């Protein structure tokens, strides 16, 4: 059992100005990470960020801490999280650091690390960094202090990497695509990738100002994208979240296409092309419709705990190459080491171009079960609502009523004081009623 104090399921995250997302904490974090990670010869760390205004402050703090530990910082500027993972590998850096709170509002921020091979740090390394933070900061000799520099061609490098995951013999020239970059880190990457592959691109959510990241745009709110797809009579829409590790799509009729459907399309295309290795990994939240659709194709399916790090662990355990969360994290280990929204989107576009099929038609082989997800906020430190007898009783009643034609899942958020209530079944009205019954029970605790 991990006893990490600061690191959550996706690094360290919180409201800017409140512990732990403060300049002094982040400076010490940089120093502690530098002490732990300085094990090889390069002594350099890649630092990327999304478009939050607080990114400037936090990257300066990290730089100071790393320099004190004798490590040099290479800044990418605003860059998608998977791009930092990629650049960490190609530069042979000790590690990569991303300053982002992903899909959260601008006033939150976070720090997450990538190892030298572009994967998330093991728990043991995070625990070692936390242990180092209990010590007093000590500065290396002046001659050994770290330096700072910028990778001026970081964006171009990642654009070329993304394009290389799309087959040379295909083109997007017949497609009109609306792309929504959430006013986040993909704003200068995704539109260029799609244009250079031949698409007619209409870009929205590409004017970051430091405070508008994820604000009524992006993968967590596709209403603007849906409206624009319909208004432009586009073939599809593609939305990323603030740091570009998630992708959600919209078909030409304005229907939202979730991560489960995206993985289904990619897995089925892999099967058709003969390069699917093993099965596909989802999570406890993955729709039953995905499991049934993959089963009909003869593709094995396994569920991991919620969180892309757990999806990756399950993929590695089974030796499989495809995994996803319904929220839009899609991991394709034959192409990337982490969730990469642009790359995942390109694989769906590959299936469209190769088969001359619309996104709507590609989704038609999978029937999504009605699923309700309700987030219920509780007071941190007031006890665990999931352990309350009244909540357990109502949950048991609902599970009995659904039988084997539905599912109930209650879990705590890894980053916020929220209980996530998920109910899934064949009848939408029944699912909604059951979700509200459980939600009311949690609120009453």
From Swiss-Prot:
It is an enzyme of class 5 (isomerase). It catalyses: alpha-D-glucosamine 1-phosphate = D-glucosamine 6-phosphate. It comes from the Bacteria. One of its GO terms (cellular component) is cytosol. Activated by phosphorylation. The keyword Isomerase applies. One of its GO terms (biological process) is peptidoglycan biosynthetic process. Binds 1 Mg(2+) ion per subunit. Its EC number is 5.4.2.10. Keywords: Isomerase, Magnesium, Metal-binding, Phosphoprotein. The modification Phosphoserine is found at residue 102. GO terms for molecular function: magnesium ion binding; phosphoglucosamine mutase activity; phosphomannomutase activity. The active site is at residue 102. Catalyzes the conversion of glucosamine-6-phosphate to glucosamine-1-phosphate. PANTHER family: PHOSPHOGLUCOMUTASE (ALPHA-D-GLUCOSE-1,6-BISPHOSPHATE-DEPENDENT), PHOSPHOHEXOSE MUTASE. This is Phosphoglucosamine mutase.
């Amino acid at each position: 059992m991990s006893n990490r104090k600061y690191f959550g399921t996706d690094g360290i995250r919180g409201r800017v100005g409140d512990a732990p997302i403060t300049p002094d904490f982040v400076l010490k974090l940089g120093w502690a990470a530098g002490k732990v990670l300085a094990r090889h010869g390069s002594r350099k760390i890649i630092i990327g960020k999304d478009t939050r205004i607080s990114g400037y402050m936090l990257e300066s703090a990290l730089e100071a801490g790393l320099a004190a530990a004798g490590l040099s910082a290479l800044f990418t500027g605003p860059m998608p999280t998977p791009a930092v993972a990629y650049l960490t590998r190609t530069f042979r850096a000790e590690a990569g650091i991303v300053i982002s709170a992903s899909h959260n509002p601008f006033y939150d921020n976070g720090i997450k690390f990538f190892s030298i091979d572009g994967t998330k740090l093991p728990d043991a390394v995070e625990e070692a960094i936390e242990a180092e933070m209990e010590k007093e900061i000590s500065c290396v000799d002046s001659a050994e202090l770290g330096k700072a520099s910028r990778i001026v061609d970081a964006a171009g490098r990642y654009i070329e990497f993304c394009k290389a995951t799309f087959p040379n013999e295909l083109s997007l020239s017949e497609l009109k695509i609306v792309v929504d970059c959430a006013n986040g880190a993909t704003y200068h990457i995704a539109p260029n990738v799609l244009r250079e592959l031949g698409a007619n691109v209409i870009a929205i959510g590409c004017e970051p100002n430091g405070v508008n990241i994820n604000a009524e745009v992006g993968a967590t709110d596709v209403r603007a994208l849906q409206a624009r797809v319909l208004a432009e009579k586009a073939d599809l829409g593609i939305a990323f979240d603030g740091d570009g590790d998630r992708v959600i799509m919209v078909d030409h009729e304005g229907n939202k296409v979730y991560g489960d459907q995206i993985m289904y399309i990619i897995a089925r295309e892999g099967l058709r092309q003969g390069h699917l290795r093993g099965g596909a990994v989802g999570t406890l939240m993955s729709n039953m419709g995905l499991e049934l659709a993959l089963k009909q194709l003869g593709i094995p399916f396994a569920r991991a705990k919620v969180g892309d790090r757990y999806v990756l662990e399950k993929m590695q355990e089974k030796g499989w190459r495809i995994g996803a969360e319904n929220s839009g994290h899609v991991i394709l280990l034959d192409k990337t080491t982490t969730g990469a929204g642009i790359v995942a989107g390109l694989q769906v576009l590959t299936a469209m171009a190769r088969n001359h099929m619309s996104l709507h038609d590609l989704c038609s082989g999978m029937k999504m079960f009605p699923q309700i997800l309700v987030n219920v906020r509780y007071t941190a430190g007031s006890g665990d609502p999931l352990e309350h007898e009244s909540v357990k009783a109502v949950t048991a009643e609902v599970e009995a009523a659904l039988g084997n034609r539905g599912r109930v899942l209650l879990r705590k958020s890894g980053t916020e004081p929220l209980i996530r209530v998920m109910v899934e079944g064949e009848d939408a009205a029944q699912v909604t009623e059951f979700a509200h019954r459980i939600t009311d029970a949690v609120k009453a605790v």
